C-alpha cells in the first residue's frame, strides 16, 4: 500500500475514520481479506476504485513488492459483486436478448453475416454464463440457480418474441414460407454445429473469463462475435415459424454446444487462476517471513 490517508472522524454514518490508500491490484485481494477479518465490511464499508494513472515512486515500489503482475491478478470480491449483478433477471437483459435474437432471425432470412455479428455483439448472455462459472468454482448453488434461471427465461422469451414476430410477418405477407433459403453459404454455420463450434466456444469462454478477471472489458467484444448462441436462437425461432423443421434440431444443438463450451472453459479458467494465484500468494508470504 502507498499514499495512505487517514481522516479521523470524517465518517458520519456509520461514525468513524475514513482511510484511503493506493493499493497494487496484485495485493488488493489480500488486503480486502484482512479488512474483512476485522469486520470492516460489517461495521463500515470497503470501496474499490480503479486509478488509471498514478505518478508516484511510493506506488511504484508498492507494485514492485506485490506478488505477480497486475494484469494477472484477480480481485475475487470484485468478480463476486459483478457476477451477482449478472444473475438478476432484469427487463434490460430480456429486451437486449430479444432484440439480438430478432436481429439474428433477420440475418437468417437474408443470409447476412453482418447482421449475425450485430446480433452476437448485442446479446447480453455472457454475464450470466460467467456467474455460473463463478458459482461452480465457489460452490454457490444459489448463484448457479439464479443465473441458469436468467438464461433460461431470457432465451425462452427472446425465442418466443422472435417466433411471434415471424408468424405475424408471415400472416401479413412480409415473409413467406420459402423465405428461409435452404442454401445459405454465409450463415449456414448458425444451424450446422461441428467440432469447431465446441472448440470456438471453449476459446471464447476462456477469453471471456480472463477479460473479466483482468478488467479488460474491450476483449469481451471478441468473445461476443465468436460464439453462436444468439444467432442459433434466432434461427430456431424463424425456422419454427416458417416450418423449416430440418433446421430446428441443428439450431438447438448449436445453442447448447456453445453454452456448454463456454461454461466448461470459463469454469476451468477460474479454477486455474484461483490455484495459480494461491501459490503466488503463498510464495510472497514466505518471502516476507524470511525478510522480517
Functional labels for PLM-detected ranges:
Residues 1, 120-129, 226-233:
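Short, proline-centered helix/strand-breaking motifs
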Residues 1-73:
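Soluble N-terminal domains of membrane-associated systems
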Residues 13-15, 126, 217:
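Short flexible coil/turn linkers enriched for glycine and charged/polar residues
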Residues 23, 67-71, 87, 91-94, ...:
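Catalytic cores of large soluble enzymes that bind and process phosphate-bearing ligands
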Residues 57-101, 107:
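Cytosolic-side membrane-insertion boundary helix
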Residues 85-168:
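Core alpha-helical transmembrane segments of integral membrane proteins
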Residues 152-292:
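Generic detector of multi-pass transmembrane helix bundles and their immediately adjacent loops
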Amino acid at each position: 500500500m502507498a499514499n495512505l490517508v487517514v481522516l479521523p472522524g470524517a465518517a458520519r454514518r456509520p461514525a468513524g475514520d475514513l482511510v484511503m490508500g493506493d493499493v497494487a491490484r496484485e495485493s488488493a485481494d489480500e488486503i480486502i481479506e484482512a479488512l474483512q477479518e476485522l469486520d470492516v465490511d460489517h461495521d463500515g464499508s470497503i470501496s474499490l476504485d480503479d486509478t488509471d494513472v498514478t505518478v508516484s515512486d511510493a506506488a511504484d515500489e508498492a507494485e514492485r513488492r506485490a506478488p505477480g503482475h497486475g494484469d494477472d491478478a484477480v480481485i475475487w470480491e470484485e468478480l463476486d459483486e459483478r457476477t451477482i449483478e449478472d444473475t438478476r433477471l432484469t427487463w434490460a437483459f430480456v429486451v437486449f436478448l430479444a432484440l439480438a435474437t430478432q436481429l439474428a432471425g433477420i440475418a437468417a432470412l437474408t443470409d447476412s453475416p453482418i447482421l449475425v455479428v450485430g446480433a452476437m455483439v448485442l446479446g447480453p448472455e455472457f454475464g450470466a454464463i460467467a456467474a455460473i462459472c463463478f458459482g461452480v468454482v465457489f460452490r454457490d448453488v444459489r448463484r448457479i440457480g439464479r443465473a441458469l434461471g436468467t438464461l433460461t427465461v431470457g432465451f425462452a422469451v427472446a425465442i418466443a418474441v422472435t417466433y411471434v414476430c415471424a408468424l405475424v410477418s408471415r400472416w401479413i405477407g412480409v415473409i413467406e414460407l420459402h423465405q428461409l433459403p435452404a442454401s445459405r453459404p454465409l450463415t449456414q454455420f448458425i444451424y450446422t454445429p461441428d467440432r469447431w463450434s465446441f472448440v470456438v466456444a471453449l476459446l471464447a469462454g476462456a477469453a471471456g473469463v480472463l477479460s473479466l478477471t483482468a478488467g479488460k472489458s474491450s476483449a469481451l467484444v471478441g468473445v461476443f462475435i465468436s460464439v453462436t448462441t444468439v444467432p442459433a436462437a434466432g434461427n430456431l425461432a424463424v425456422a419454427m415459424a416458417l416450418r423449416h423443421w430440418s433446421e430446428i434440431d441443428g439450431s438447438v444443438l448449436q445453442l447448447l454446444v456453445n453454452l456448454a463450451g463456454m461454461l466448461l472453459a470459463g469454469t476451468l479458467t477460474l479454477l486455474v487462476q484461483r490455484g495459480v494465484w494461491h501459490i503466488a500468494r503463498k510464495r510472497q508470504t514466505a518471502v516476507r517471513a524470511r525478510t522480517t
